[in-house]
């Protein structure tokens, strides 16, 4: 009877809760990396498990305490300041132009205002869907190739605004209905970035089928992993690199490499003090520091934070937990997108792009709540 009660409680766990997402994401990395774990070594493995446990517990703490994060204007103002700082700082690092940096922030704020005003209208989704398709077509025309089949183009568009616009617009619009989902899925595959495909798929499941049975979720996850493995193999073939690995072995090796990078970070005792997470394309410093060549390298969700701030990065994990709780209790569609982002970054590692999207989602959620309060006041 006791075992049955435990099983029933497990069944009641929300698989799409932020903490569940983070635990499942890291668990999948360890499962996939299992064939190669001997290469990391038992001692190093225990060390990275200890570090990850501290950060995940820190992330979990805000959800343990029975506190309700209620809206007040301070959240709106703080989210605005955070978004403004990250946007202007990042744009200035790239463009070295204060004018362009401010213009970039204004563009983001205009998009946020339009979202708050029209997000319930179908025309808004249709426009975003069209923008996503147009941005993809422009990439193909400008670079003269489909990124999935051309490795050089794929690497070139890593920081291309058109790619980010296309991916963001298609993920948001693609979870609205099946037709948009199928078209968006195909385009994101052709864009050549597995993270975009994963995010669309997970966001669609969370938003449309939140109460899906666990066994079906496992089957869908397995099918998605196989597909992402095949996609990774196609990308590798287009790079002219000779890897004698099948799609599943490729995923396993990629997961192992993420853990290997984390073990190198833990053993390095280097503190980069924000150079990785607060700088656009800061991930290439990981390769420079650990492997002596500048190259964008992924690790686990909190690996970059640990490299920047060491064990004190656990405080950031707690702050991320607080923000995640606020987004989780907010707009369901925005949370579906955030949950998919959180899962994807379990393998990538928190970076500047993640922080910008996080601050944008926080700001939009606060704006939505504020708009509802104003509406209630006006109706009184």
UniProtKB/Swiss-Prot annotation:
Its main location: membrane. It is a multi-pass membrane protein. The keyword Transferase does not apply. The chain crosses the membrane at residues 15-35, 45-65, 75-95, 98-118, 123-143, 182-202, 217-237, 303-323, 341-361. Keywords: Cell membrane, Membrane, Transmembrane, Transmembrane helix. InterPro entries: O_anti_polymase (IPR002760). It is found in: Cell membrane. The keyword Protease does not apply. Signal peptide: none annotated. GO terms for cellular component: plasma membrane. This is Uncharacterized protein MJ0420. It comes from Methanocaldococcus jannaschii (strain ATCC 43067 / DSM 2661 / JAL-1 / JCM 10045 / NBRC 100440).
């Amino acid at each position: 009877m006791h075992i049955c009660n435990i099983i029933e409680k497990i069944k009641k766990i929300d698989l799409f809760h932020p903490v569940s997402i983070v635990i499942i994401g890291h668990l999948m990395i360890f499962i996939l990396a299992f064939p190669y774990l001997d290469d990391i070594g038992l001692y190093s493995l225990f060390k990275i498990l200890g570090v990850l446990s501290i950060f995940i517990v820190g992330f979990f703490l805000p959800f343990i305490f029975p506190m309700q994060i209620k809206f007040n204007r301070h959240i709106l103002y703080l989210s605005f300041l955070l978004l403004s700082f990250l946007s202007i700082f990042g744009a200035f690092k790239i463009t070295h132009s204060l004018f362009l940096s401010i213009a970039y922030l204004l563009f983001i704020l205009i998009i946020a205002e339009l979202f708050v005003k029209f997000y319930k209208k179908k025309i808004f989704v249709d426009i975003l869907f069209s923008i996503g398709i147009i941005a993809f077509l422009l990439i193909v025309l400008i670079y003269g190739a489909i990124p999935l089949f051309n490795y050089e183009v794929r690497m070139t568009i890593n920081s291309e605004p058109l790619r980010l616009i296309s991916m963001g617009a298609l993920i948001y619009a693609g979870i609205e209905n099946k037709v948009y989902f199928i078209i968006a899925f195909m385009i994101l595959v052709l864009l050549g970035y597995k993270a975009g495909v994963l995010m669309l798929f997970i966001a669609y499941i969370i938003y449309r089928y939140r109460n899906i049975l666990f066994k079906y979720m496992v089957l869908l996850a397995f099918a998605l992993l196989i597909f992402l493995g095949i996609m990774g193999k196609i990308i590798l073939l287009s790079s002219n690199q000779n890897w004698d690995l099948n799609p599943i072995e490729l995923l396993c090796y990629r997961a192992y490499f993420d853990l290997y990078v984390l073990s190198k970070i833990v053993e390095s005792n280097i503190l980069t003090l924000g150079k990785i997470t607060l700088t656009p394309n800061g991930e290439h410093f990981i390769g420079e520091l650990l492997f002596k060549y500048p190259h964008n390298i992924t690790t686990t969700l909190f690996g970059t934070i640990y490299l920047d701030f060491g064990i004190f990065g656990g405080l950031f994990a707690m702050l991320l937990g607080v923000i995640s709780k606020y987004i989780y209790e907010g707009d369901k569609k925005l949370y579906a997108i955030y949950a998919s982002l959180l899962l994807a970054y379990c393998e990538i590692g928190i970076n500047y792009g993640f922080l910008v999207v996080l601050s944008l989602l926080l700001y939009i959620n606060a704006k939505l709540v504020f708009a509802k309060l104003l509406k209630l006041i006006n109706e009184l």
